[in-house]
């Protein structure tokens, strides 16, 4: 079975563990002692790690027992922990991922066999994120009957988890712990049988796919912030340490910094373990290429290519590979992670088996709004953010009313407003998301009666952004931020008071990526309202994120390709911000003049804020604590 803890080598990092996933093809290659020694030397000369996951099955290929034992014995002798892995995939066709057909007798037998094989050799087993259900064979169609594909697949995969994975594994090895890794496409899980509600609790633990890759050239177009948000969300699905770690691969990036960012953001979310996929890439003798990073190559960025290239644990002089990029990036954040508290953010509710305004939270995260996503309604939060996904909760209007009656705030998006029209939201506010669209490039901020003040950026003509028109009644609802086009206005943020609370509607562009096109004063005004009682806010261009913690520490990270000047407002009276990486201390600066959007477009600030300003290099982070 797995290696006893007492035989492990010293922990590679202080604040997390590092693991490498070894796919079955790489496991079989390690059967050769020469290959094994060479690849191990290549990786360990550039990267420290604590554990390997040795895969027993993928795409029709099984590892044999003798090879598994030989490879396991090799790593144990090196003081490396061992665990098993399974990828329940079928052979790929046409570049598409194919799953097993769980109505097919042969595929069901393969599923059971893989589980039994893994449990026979390991006390810990992880399922790679192919444990979903995409086939539509004649048998599947017949078994589905009158159910939707979503309902059929959810029910079938709960059965498969129990009957073909967990029970067979535990019958072979009563001590085995089985972890299911969930991928990065959480908005669409239920349609393919992934179930964060019931299935996630069937397994001993879960794991988070935090690979976001490139946000513009990949088919998924996942935004960078998701590497953080997904781990936080899944940690609220399975709290108390049952979300065991985050998982990042080396694929689909245009510049090497993007790989480092995924690792950093996973660990900023307080993942206890980071898994690197995969062994073959990390062991490759080919040198890693810097990629398209010429625009910032001469700047003092968080990922310093020259520093990385010069550094290695053993100084072998070999050209650095992906392993060194990973090692360098992990070593950087390990220096300060222990000084950070528990992550905090704007509480946002996404019910189980829900979708709507898909992945919107990550665009908001890239706009500088820290988000804490949860599958349970956060009734104790002073402000709750609800996107269209909340429509899946049949009691959502009642929850909104109760939250407002308790003197708290609720922010709903235009997508949720539309979804709830005719379903009771009119009892709170008579607002209507119409079918009309208005292309906006001028913006006004105003709180209360009056003409308001321009929120446009001086010297910059904003691009047209297409917003849904929200109809409201004058003096019943108040637009706090409005867009204007040819003497016609559309609310960008509108407020309606109800009982002791306040309902806000945030208008989302037809293309959520157009949030990045909003003038900086508009984005800063939105942050003021959304972040409520959170102690830190930033005034920054798009693609600059804020990560807040509950002990007066925070991180500002820029995903931009040029330097960013960032205003920072911290609740209370403070003299200095101290950079926990460089040791630099930043003095407070005078508060912005009255024309600053954050002051003029919202209600009077509650309490005292101290203002600071920091420069953040491209694709870099800065870590601060207040003094």
Which role does the model predict for each range below?
Residues 8-381, 385, 393-396, 404-405, ...:
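Glycan-processing catalytic domains of CAZymes
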Residues 388-627:
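A conserved amphipathic helix/loop scaffold
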């Amino acid at each position: 079975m797995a290696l006893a803890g007492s035989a492990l080598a010293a922990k590679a990092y202080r604040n997390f563990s590092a693991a490498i996933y070894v796919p079955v093809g790489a496991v079989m290659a390690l059967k050769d002692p020469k290959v094994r020694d060479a690849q191990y030397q290549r990786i360990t000369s550039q990267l420290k790690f604590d554990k390997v996951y040795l895969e027993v099955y993928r795409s029709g290929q099984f590892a044999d027992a003798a090879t598994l034992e030989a490879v396991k014995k090799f790593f144990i002798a090196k003081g490396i922990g061992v665990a098993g892995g399974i990828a329940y995939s079928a052979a790929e066709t046409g570049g598409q991922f194919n799953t097993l057909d769980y109505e097919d007798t042969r595929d069901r037998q393969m599923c059971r066999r893989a589980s039994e094989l893994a449990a026979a050799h390991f006390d810990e087993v992880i399922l790679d994120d192919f444990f979903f259900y995409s086939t539509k064979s004649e048998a599947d169609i017949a078994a589905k009957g009158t159910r939707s594909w979503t309902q059929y697949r959810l029910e079938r995969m709960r059965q498969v988890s129990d009957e073909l994975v967990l029970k067979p594994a535990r019958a072979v090895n009563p001590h085995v712990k089985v972890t299911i890794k969930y991928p990065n496409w959480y908005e669409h899980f239920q349609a393919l049988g992934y179930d964060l509600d019931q299935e996630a609790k069937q397994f001993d633990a879960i794991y988070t796919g935090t690979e976001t890759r490139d946000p513009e050239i990949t088919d998924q177009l996942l935004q960078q912030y998701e590497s953080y948000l997904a781990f936080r969300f899944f940690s609220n699905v399975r709290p108390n340490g049952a979300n065991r770690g985050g998982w990042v691969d080396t694929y689909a990036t245009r510049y090497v910094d993007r790989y480092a960012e995924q690792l950093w953001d996973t660990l900023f979310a307080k993942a206890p373990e980071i898994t690197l996929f995969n062994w073959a890439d990390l062991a490759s003798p080919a040198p890693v290429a810097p990629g398209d990073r010429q625009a910032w190559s001469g700047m003092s960025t968080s990922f310093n290519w020259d520093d990385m290239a010069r550094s290695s644990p053993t100084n072998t002089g070999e050209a650095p590979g992906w392993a060194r990029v990973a090692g360098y990036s992990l070593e950087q954040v390990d220096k300060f992670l222990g000084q950070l508290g528990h992550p905090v953010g704007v509480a946002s509710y996404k019910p189980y088996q829900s979708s709507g305004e898909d992945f919107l939270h990550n665009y908001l995260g890239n706009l500088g709004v820290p988000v804490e996503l949860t599958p349970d309604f956060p009734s104790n939060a002073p402000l709750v953010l609800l996107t269209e996904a909340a429509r899946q909760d049949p009691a959502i209007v009642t929850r909104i009313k109760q939250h407002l009656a308790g003197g708290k705030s609720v922010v709903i998006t235009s997508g949720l407003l539309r979804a709830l029209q005719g379903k009771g939201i009119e009892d709170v506010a008579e607002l209507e998301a119409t079918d009309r669209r208005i292309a906006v490039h001028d913006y006004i901020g105003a709180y209360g009666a009056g003409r308001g003040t321009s929120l446009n950026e001086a010297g910059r003509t904003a691009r047209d952004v297409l917003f849904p028109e929200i109809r409201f009644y004058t003096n019943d609802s108040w637009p706090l931020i409005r867009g204007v086009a040819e003497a016609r206005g559309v609310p960008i943020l509108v407020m309606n008071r109800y009982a002791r609370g306040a309902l806000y509607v945030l208008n989302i562009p037809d293309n959520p990526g157009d949030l990045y096109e909003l003038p900086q004063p508009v984005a800063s005004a939105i942050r003021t309202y959304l972040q409520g009682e959170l102690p830190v806010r930033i005034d920054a261009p798009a693609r600059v994120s804020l990560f807040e913690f509950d002990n007066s520490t925070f991180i500002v990270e820029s995903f931009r390709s040029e330097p960013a000047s960032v205003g920072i407002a911290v609740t209370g009276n403070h003299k200095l911000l101290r950079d926990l990486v460089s040791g630099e201390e930043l003095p407070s600066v005078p508060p912005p003049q009255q024309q600053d959007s954050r002051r003029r477009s919202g209600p009077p600030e509650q309490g005292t804020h101290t203002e600071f300003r920091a420069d953040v290099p491209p694709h870099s982070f800065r870590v601060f604590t207040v003094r």
